[in-house]
Amino acid sequence: MSSESKGIPIPRSDSNKTSDVSSWEEDYELISLGSSQDALQRSGIRSAHGDSGYASSPLRMEHLSSSTIIINNQLKKIDVNESIPENSTLHNKYELGAVESSTSSLSLLQSKEEDDSSNWETEDSESAVEEAELPTIFEGKTVISPSSSGTDHSEAVEYTVPTAPPIPDLRFQQSYLQSIQRANGSAFLVALITLRDHVLYPFLSGGMWVFVRHIFQFLKLQEKGFHFGQSLRRNLGLFSTFKD
C-alpha cells in the first residue's frame, strides 16, 4: 500500500504547497456521511501544514439534506430541521443590530416630524383664536414685510378707515366759481347762477335785517309787563318816539 493511500503526508515542492494552500481557501467544507474518516485526516493534514493566514468566516449553507460539516477543525453533523450553529449567526446578529438602529433612527425622525406638525397646529390654532378675538371694525389687507435679518417675516394688517368728506368752502367766491364750473358752459345756467348769487341772495339778506329793525322800532312796549323794553329805553335810549 502506498503512503498516499494510508493518508500519510508527503513533503512536496513549493509549487505543490502553494496549490494546496489555494485549495484550502474556503474556511468550512461540506463532507458526506460516508467519508467522515477522510474528513478527519484532511483536517489533520491542514493542521500539519500550519497555514498562518487561516481565518474564520461566516458559514455558507445552501440546499443541505443531512451531512457533516467542519467548523474550526471540528466535525459536526447537522440536519435540515436543525438550526444553524451559533458561530454562524454572528453575521445575522450584526445585520439585526443594523436593522434595529435604522428602525430606531426612523422612529426618532417620525416622532420629530410629529412634534413639529403638532407645534405648527398649535401655533395656527392660537393665531386663529387671536384673530377671532380682535374686533374687525374695517376690512383690511394683510401685508408681509421682510425683517432686517432676512430670515423671519413680520405680518401686519392694514385697515382702510373711511375718511369724512372735506368741509365745503362756504366763501361766496368759491361757491360761485364752482357753480359756474358745474354749468358746463351753458349761457342760461351761467346767467341764472349770476342772478341768484349777486341779486337774490343779497336782497334777501338785506331785507331780513331791515325787517328785524322795523320790528324793534314799531313794537309798542308798555311799562306793564315789558321789563325788557323798559331796560332798553333807559339804558340805550331806544324807541325815543314812544312816551311813557
UniProtKB/Swiss-Prot annotation:
Residues 165-184 are annotated as: Involved in MIM complex binding. Required for normal vegetative cell population growth but is dispensable for mitophagy. The chain crosses the membrane at residues 199-215. Residues 1-24, 105-131 are annotated as: Disordered. GO terms for cellular component: mitochondrial outer membrane; mitochondrion. Residues 216-244 are mitochondrial intermembrane. Interacts (via N-terminal atg8 interacting motif) with atg8; the interaction is direct. Interacts with the mitochondrial outer import machinery (MIM) complex subunits mim1 and mim2. Mitophagy receptor that tethers atg8 to the mitochondrial outer membrane to promote selective autophagy. This is Mitophagy receptor atg43. It comes from Schizosaccharomyces pombe (strain 972 / ATCC 24843) (Fission yeast).
